[in-house]
Amino acid sequence: MTESPLSAPAPTSNQSPAPEQTFGTAGIAPMDRPSAMTRFFMSIVAWAESLNLKYAKLGNPPVYDTATFPWAAEIEKDYPAIRAELEKVLLRQSELPTFQDISTDVKTISTDTRWKTFFLLGFGVKSEQNIKACPNTWAAVQKIPGLTTAMFSIFEPGKHLPAHRGPYNGVLRLHLGLIVPEPNDKLAIRVDNQVCHWQEGKALIFDDAYEHEAWNHTDKTRVVLFVDFVKPLKSPARFVNWALMNLAIFTPFIKEGLDNHKEWEKKFYAEAEAFRNRPKP
């Protein structure tokens, strides 16, 4: 693997052995008391994860060389247009929901108000109003095969997201640096044993099924375009993964997140409409 400007050097024969993924979500609690249906679904997920490791088309590194994904360069070219739309969104930054406002299971790793979100797509479900507000960003992410989630991820000053593992290894994650304050050594993301630094207009692609943590120890806000997309897999894992991704939306914790976002979206845009229609002085 060639070295990405955002990733740590690839391991050599003198470095630690290749990393191994563990199974099962760590750090994020899907449900306190999962139903029998949810327990059954999670047992299938564990089986699917073992298939995904075995049949991965591009291997299972914690951090990928972005050149492996030709479309990543196209997304980087869209940075100016995406950044311009983000600036408009940030005019109402204080009104944006925290991640745990939308997905309550995230409360196990984030309870403050320093991680805000602006979803365009969550688990394959569109936020039509947010897409309307950011058409260029939406057009850009359409270039990503297997897109499942797209949002602005906003780390306010002092935010530190503790070590955790994502819920499922059937997707990969892209971060496109949009606002990356200085000094660079005060903010980063660690994926397994690799510490990566964001750069504005540059993509970072990693597997969040490895333990990872992120921090912003500067006095300014950091923003990335946060995207999940389907991991390239060979058969039979590809078919199992497709089925699970389509069934996941019916699980209680994902349905709850989608409902929470709909409620926030309704309120957010109702307030904007009321402001536009206010009596003129």
Swiss-Prot record:
Its EC number is 1.14.11.58. GO terms for biological process: lipid metabolic process. One of its GO terms (molecular function) is dioxygenase activity. Disruption phenotype: Partial deletion of this gene causes serious deficiencies in nodule development, nodulation competitiveness and nitrogen fixation on Phaseolus vulgaris plants. Mutation affects the membrane lipid composition, particularly ornithine lipids. Mutant is deficient in OL hydroxylation and is more susceptible to acid and temperature stress. Mutation causes an increase in nodule number that is reverted by the deletion of olsE. One of its GO terms (cellular component) is membrane. Pathway: Lipid metabolism. It comes from the Bacteria. The keyword Zinc does not apply. SUPFAM superfamilies: Clavaminate synthase-like (SSF51197). Residues 1-29 are annotated as: Disordered. Keywords: Dioxygenase, Lipid biosynthesis, Lipid metabolism, Oxidoreductase. Residues 1-24 have a biased composition (Polar residues). InterPro entries: Asp/Arg/Pro-Hydrxlase, Asp/Asn_beta-hydroxylase, IPNS-like_sf. It catalyses: an N(2)-[(3R)-3-(2-saturated-acyloxy)acyl]-L-ornithine lipid + 2-oxoglutarate + O2 = a 2-hydroxyornithine lipid + succinate + CO2. Belongs to the aspartyl/asparaginyl beta-hydroxylase family. Involved in the biosynthesis of ornithine lipids (OLs), which are phosphorus-free membrane lipids. Catalyzes the hydroxylation at the 2 position of the secondary fatty acid of OL. Contributes to symbiotic performance and acid tolerance. This is Ornithine lipid ester-linked acyl 2-hydroxylase. The gene is olsC.
